[in-house]
């Protein structure tokens, strides 16, 4: 294993201070990022200098490997300033488990780099993937695509693409590691929210690409790290759903906190049209509004923080060889997704209340409130956060019925 040395401190407080110092730049660049459909290379450099791409990276490769609860704080802080920048941060922190789960050789390729940007883009790990792989001597031939929603593929050296791998008449969903120089990014990220995340589709430059055998791993093995973990940290034994979705909810929380701060700034001394109130902050309707926003935001934060901490606890248990009961893990996986979706909904509703009471000037392109309003709705639309489906699935478990499964995961 080749360790990569970094001089910067990895403490949570240091990283948060760095994010706060560059946060205003993220907000200033947001309009241009939306027009370009991607954050700028300067923003990627600022994130890298702040250390955010190493918060979920193995210590053995110079990463900070922060606990999930601390990663949640970093992602929340970035989201206060800009949603698209937070999305890039979230993906950059939480997809590293896929690289680790693919085994030591793949992890070595991904993390043994001096790059200060994100390490890995992971996309299309769904049964409906358009990617295909067929077995040949010494490896696989990959074809098909394109792969949509390839967040961070603009900046990573590697992308892990979902494929249906076929061998000896049998098939499975797998992840295959492809270097950036064999891929092209399609200009198809034209969306209503998270516009600057640069989540374009990617496609193979050639019709077919050969990859060595070790770079293709069934997703069932990736999810359980069946290829063996040489890393010491408990993060790599924590439930990946808890890691991914509790921190995802952190984006919604940060967006809501940023809008609340912006609302208070705008409301000070602002008259409410159609009333005798000359200062919105002194008006009783505002006080009721703020109280309602507080309850929604606090509920979201309490659920999300509890799930992040529980993820860390389960990781420590697994690292100490204390087995996690399968039924306990199933309940946790169902609950963390449901509560992440509910937290995202509560935060989107809080932002909606603040937006609706910010006046018509809040719809200006330069106004962070309207941007966060759109970005927060995008989080609620993520395919894994379908609240109605998640309500049903957890309710089935409560009623003693087997939950629905997706790709073998409840």
Language model feature labels by segment:
Residues 288-342:
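C-terminal structural cap/anchor segments
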């Amino acid at each position: 294993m080749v360790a990569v040395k970094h001089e910067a401190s990895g403490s949570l407080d240091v990283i948060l201070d760095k994010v706060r110092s560059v946060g205003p730049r993220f907000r200033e660049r947001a309009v241009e990022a939306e027009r370009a459909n991607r954050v700028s290379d300067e923003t990627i450099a600022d994130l890298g200098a702040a250390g955010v791409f190493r918060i979920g990276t193995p210590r053995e490769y110079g990463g900070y490997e922060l606990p999930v609860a601390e990663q949640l704080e970093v992602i929340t802080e970035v989201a206060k300033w800009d949603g698209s920048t937070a999305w890039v941060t979230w993906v950059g922190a939480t997809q590293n488990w896929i690289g680790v789960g693919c085994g030591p050789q793949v992890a070595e390729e991904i993390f043994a780099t001096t790059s200060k940007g994100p390490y890995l883009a992971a996309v299309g790990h769904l049964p409906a993937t358009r990617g295909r792989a067929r077995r040949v001597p010494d490896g696989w031939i990959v074809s098909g695509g394109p792969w949509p929603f390839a967040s961070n593929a603009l900046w990573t050296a590697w992308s892990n693409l979902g494929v249906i791998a076929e061998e000896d008449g049998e098939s499975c969903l797998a992840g295959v590691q492809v270097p950036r120089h064999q891929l092209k990014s399609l200009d198809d990220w034209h969306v209503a929210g998270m516009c600057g995340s640069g989540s374009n589709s990617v496609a193979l430059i050639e019709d077919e690409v050969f990859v060595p055998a070790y770079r293709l791993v069934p997703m069932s093995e990736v999810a359980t790290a069946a290829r063996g973990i040489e890393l010491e940290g408990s993060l790599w034994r924590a439930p990946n759903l808890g890691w991914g979705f509790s921190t995802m909810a952190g984006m919604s929380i940060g967006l809501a906190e940023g809008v609340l701060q912006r609302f208070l700034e705008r409301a000070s001394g602002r008259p409410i049209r159609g009333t005798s109130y000359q200062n919105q902050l002194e008006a009783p309707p505002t006080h009721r509004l703020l109280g309602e926003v507080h309850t929604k935001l606090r509920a979201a934060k309490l659920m999300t923080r509890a799930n992040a901490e529980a993820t860390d606890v389960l990781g420590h248990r697994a690292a100490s060889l204390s087995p996690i009961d399968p039924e306990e893990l199933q309940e946790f996986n169902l609950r963390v997704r449901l509560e992440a979706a509910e937290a995202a909904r509560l935060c989107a509703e809080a932002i909606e209340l603040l937006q609706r009471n910010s006046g018509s000037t809040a719809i200006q392109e330069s106004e962070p409130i309207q941007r966060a309003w759109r970005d927060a709705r995008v989080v609620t639309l993520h395919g894994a956060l379908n609240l109605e489906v998640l309500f049903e699935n957890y309710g089935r478990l409560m009623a003693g019925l087997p939950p629905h499964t997706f790709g073998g995961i409840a």
